[in-house]
Amino acid sequence: MSYQGRARKFLESASIDVGDMVLVEKPDVTYEGMVLDRADDADDRHIVLKLENGYNIGVEISDARIELLEKGSEPRIELPPVEAAEDPELPDVSIISTGGTVASIIDYRTGAVHPAFTADDLLRANPELLDIANIRGRAVFNILSENMKPEYWVETARAVYGEIKDGADGVVVAHGTDTMHYTSAALSFMLRTPVPVVFTGAQRSSDRPSSDASLNIQCSVRAATSEIAEVTVCMHATMDDLSCHLHRGVKVRKMHTSRRDTFRSMNALPLAEVTPDGIKILEENYRKRGSDELELSDRVEERVAFIKSYPGISPDIIKWHLDEGYRGIVIEGTGLGHCPDTLIPVIGEAHDMGVPVAMTSQCLNGRVNMNVYSTGRRLLQAGVIPCDDMLPEVAYVKMCWVLGQTDDPEMAREMMRENIAGEINERTSIAYFRG
């Protein structure tokens, strides 16, 4: 039981546990229902009941009396196995979970939440997958995506590598949406893959009528059977439940806090439009299935700073990172790739110390061009690495990966300027900007 403080004492005073049926009386209303657990960080002034009509309510306890009606057991989900024989005519797709909204199912009777990443769980929630591929599923870990770290990128890459090595024809990675584009970029650099690797998630949980989880999973499995052998992100194309877009893993970004079509290709077109029934190629320039040998380069350097330029930013911010031993810096600059000229001397110091400093743009659309204005030219003279049309988050991830491959500052500069996974376009088309 996760209840703490006053709420816990309130329940314990009547020998009540999670799962028990209770009567709660307040001065003007009486409730009967099952006691549900709460999050660890919830306040201690309320308890949660599941009423007979299926709704969950919070009850403030300061003026309440509680009575045990019937002992129960803590809500849990017990599901029968799924009878599904492998179809030798279908491809084999592995689905691995790192956590997030898409990675759970909910028991509407009890309110219990269950991590949903055995093959049985996936097929029970999405029986349509049986028409697309043979499915195997497992959880690598279960964390909120805001708690992702570079070490988890490595663990995810190794898990995907293992699935492909074991014969998977495609891999789907279920991930929380907040930092999915960081992890998709990381695996784009770490893996050379002969098969599709598709990231997906959900903006809205499966207990909501507007959930996007089912379509995203189905379309992702379909994409994992395609000929696009790259690391990609597959999420809703529009607010409607019609199709998903397949985005290159280094050219995608979460662009809205809550919309189901939050993920957008930036400085690029989506690679494909996907439905559970098929895939329509939108961009012909992609790595084809079987064109690369499987390869894993998973060393990363975590001591990389990601710094946003803003009016009044102090040079001490960069100096602090240098004093703390950071090995690389990525600046999210303004406009064409600028920052206040007060930063230029300390950026020059970083360059002289062998710490590469890369420049991206907060504009997201378009590309860095540091030859237009004097500030940009002075930054180039100080040793800044221009990142063309690379997204800021991708440049940060790439710097972590590059510095895991080399200690040589000049080699790091060359690698940052090299188009390794489709993160840099030779030119930026007006077709890429939606406005």
From Swiss-Prot:
It comes from Methanothermobacter thermautotrophicus (strain ATCC 29096 / DSM 1053 / JCM 10044 / NBRC 100330 / Delta H) (Methanobacterium thermoautotrophicum). Heterodimer of GatD and GatE. Its EC number is 6.3.5.-. NCBIfam families: asnASE_I, gatD_arch, PRK04183.1. Pfam families: Asparaginase, Asparaginase_C, GatD_N. One of its GO terms (biological process) is translation. InterPro entries: AsnA_fam, Asp/glu_Ase-like_sf, Asparaginase/glutaminase-like, Asparaginase/glutaminase_AS1, Asparaginase/glutaminase_AS2, Asparaginase_C, GatD, GatD_N. Keywords: ATP-binding, Ligase, Nucleotide-binding, Protein biosynthesis. The active site is at 101, 177, 178, 254. It comes from the Archaea. One of its GO terms (molecular function) is ATP binding. Residues 91-419 form the Asparaginase/glutaminase domain. Allows the formation of correctly charged Gln-tRNA(Gln) through the transamidation of misacylated Glu-tRNA(Gln) in organisms which lack glutaminyl-tRNA synthetase. The reaction takes place in the presence of glutamine and ATP through an activated gamma-phospho-Glu-tRNA(Gln). The GatDE system is specific for glutamate and does not act on aspartate. It is an enzyme of class 6 (ligase). This is Glutamyl-tRNA(Gln) amidotransferase subunit D. Belongs to the asparaginase 1 family. GatD subfamily.
